[in-house]
Amino acid sequence: MRPSKRTPAQTRPITITRNFTAHAEGSVLVEFGETKVLCTASFTEGVPRFLKGQGQGWVTAEYGMLPRSTHSRMDREAARGKQSGRTQEIQRLIGRSLRAAVDMKALGENTIVIDCDVIQADGGTRTAAITGACVAMVDALNWARAKNIIKSNPLKFLIAAVSVGIYKGEAISDLEYLEDSAAETDMNVVMTETGKIIEVQGTAEGEPFSHEELNELLGLAKNSIREIVDVQKSALN
């Protein structure tokens, strides 16, 4: 039995609130149960130096956790003077995932910077961030089209992400912290709205897992992501 009494395939209640802040071209508060992440998308003209003159755009991401997003306060990384390896890994994952969803030529020489700030953490912050950031990015792209900065829609498809894992011998979806911290296997899956895989991060925390268990986890993720994309589409409509 899961701590939350959810069924193995059941995600937490998911809500996406658009236009959560006033200034960003796209802004979203995404909530997976008690995990809450603010995602903003800033549209800027110009690209990094390595892309200048190539007629294509760029999407990049930053990620951070507020000091009291966790059970006990942690220092701000700015105060420590450097980002942790975890932070760097997560923001690269977010950036890679979102770039897969965008036609960079259609974006032109423009950049979208995604900022994901975890307000409250209860497991699955990176997958929630990807899910919310995609919606914020859609709003930023629509803003640019409305301003005639770009002519066509660079979005190829929606993407979303979910955590899956093996907890007490059972494959489960959308792990909260109590499950994540005790899982035998922990996996983060990013997919397109049609179920194609963008990224899989999987680790045997306790016991090695089999090919059959891997396939079961990917099937679980695919079904959950289909539901999450429905939430994204509902928010965008």
Swiss-Prot record:
Q: Which Gene3D superfamilies match?
A: GHMP Kinase, N-terminal domain
Name the domain of life this protein comes from: Bacteria
Cysteine pairings via disulfide bonds: none
Biological processes, Gene Ontology terms:
rRNA catabolic process; rRNA processing; tRNA processing
Give the enzyme class.
Answer: transferase
Which function does this protein serve?
A: Phosphorolytic 3'-5' exoribonuclease that plays an important role in tRNA 3'-end maturation. Removes nucleotide residues following the 3'-CCA terminus of tRNAs; can also add nucleotides to the ends of RNA molecules by using nucleoside diphosphates as substrates, but this may not be physiologically important. Probably plays a role in initiation of 16S rRNA degradation (leading to ribosome degradation) during starvation.
Question: Per its record, how is this protein called by name?
Answer: Ribonuclease PH
Q: Which organism is it from?
A: Shewanella denitrificans (strain OS217 / ATCC BAA-1090 / DSM 15013)
Q: What is the lineage of its organism?
A: Bacteria, Pseudomonadati, Pseudomonadota, Gammaproteobacteria, Alteromonadales
